[in-house]
Amino acid sequence: MDDNKSKALTAAVGQIEKQFGKGAIMRLGDNQAMDIEAISTGSLTIDIALGIGGLPCGRVVEIYGPESSGKTTLTLQVIAEAQKNGKTCAFVDAEHALDPVYAEKLGVNIDELLVSQPDTGEQALEICDMLVRSGAVDVVIVDSVAALTPKAEIEGDMGDSHVGLQARLMSQALRKLTANIKRSNTLCIFINQIRMKIGVMFGNPETTTGGNALKFYSSVRLDIRRIGAVKEGDEVVGNETRVKVVKNKVAPPFKQAEFMIRYGEGISKEAELIDLGVKQKLVDKAGAWYSYKGDRIGQGKANVMKYLKEHPETANEIETKIRQELLLSKTVKAEEALPQGEDDVLPE
């Protein structure tokens, strides 16, 4: 750059900083926060699929799926992991269906968790914005977008038509929220439900509620599905669950994670460790027997899970080795992250 242009640029940058404050404009390489801090999801396979070891702080995340697929369970596990690291979490319960007993079973410290049960969608999003702007809350969960009912709809009569009200509400709220979320480095998770588009002959008829704004503003979108039942004898004790990373702006997208959710316990970390341990050749499998470092640790997956529960030091050792092999670090450099368009969708 020639001297005249350089002087003009320096003067312009100086004027911008004087008017709008230091940090209003900077060179990308000058930014200290090049590393993206991540909060673990409580599932090792999802952390690996996300590429940075968890959900990114300072970003909007959308988790959607059919009913009883494990959306709320996954977000409660995120809260439990965040609280273990001394972070403050808030749960905006628009569905009025949060079960504190179940949350406690998943490891959530309910005495420290902030909970709000708002009356209207506007109130819910205003509370969310105020918590984010405070800078004191690290994780905010909104459960769910479908339950964010606009005030006009609540005050109107049953059967009144309110076309696009919720979509407009979400669009306006996200325009306000995103800058504050980035500034305060808060992880904001929106849980969403699935609806069917009428008259779709070809392609996927499924869509999420609340319009398209959330799809664009989200840095990570997770599609969670129940793919089978976990049985002990004739009794169903849990779900086999699959998560697809439909959109990821901080690492390569379209990865999948499969794990087990046990009723009353949440995501089974031991089952993940066994599957990933065998895959990475850290755990040896011969027939039904599993061995670690030459020592037999159990016959059959159920017995090995029991062994790992009773020997947490072995479980932690296996987890550390898996993370070292599959995640180079818990954060990813911004320049290493794969760029992805905002309107990229999972191919059919």
Swiss-Prot record:
An annotated GO cellular component: cytosol
Presence of keyword NADP: no
InterPro entries to which the protein is assigned, alphabetical: AAA+_ATPase, DNA_recomb/repair_RecA, DNA_recomb/repair_RecA_CS, P-loop_NTPase, RecA-like_C, RecA-like_N, RecA_ATP-bd, RecA_C_sf
Example of a GO biological process term: SOS response
A molecular function GO annotation: damaged DNA binding
Disulfide bonds: none
Sequence positions that bind ATP: G65, P66, E67, S68, S69, G70, K71, T72
Major place of residence: cytoplasm
The entry's keywords: ATP-binding, Cytoplasm, DNA damage, DNA recombination, DNA repair, DNA-binding, Nucleotide-binding, SOS response
Pfam families linked: RecA (PF00154), RecA_C (PF21096)
Key word Metal-binding present: no
UniProt-listed PROSITE patterns: RECA_1, RECA_2, RECA_3
Span of the signal peptide: none
Location(s), subcellular: Cytoplasm
NCBIfam families, A to Z: tigrfam_recA
Function of the molecule: Can catalyze the hydrolysis of ATP in the presence of single-stranded DNA, the ATP-dependent uptake of single-stranded DNA by duplex DNA, and the ATP-dependent hybridization of homologous single-stranded DNAs. It interacts with LexA causing its activation and leading to its autocatalytic cleavage.
Family affiliation: Belongs to the RecA family.
The protein, known as: Protein RecA
Gene label: recA
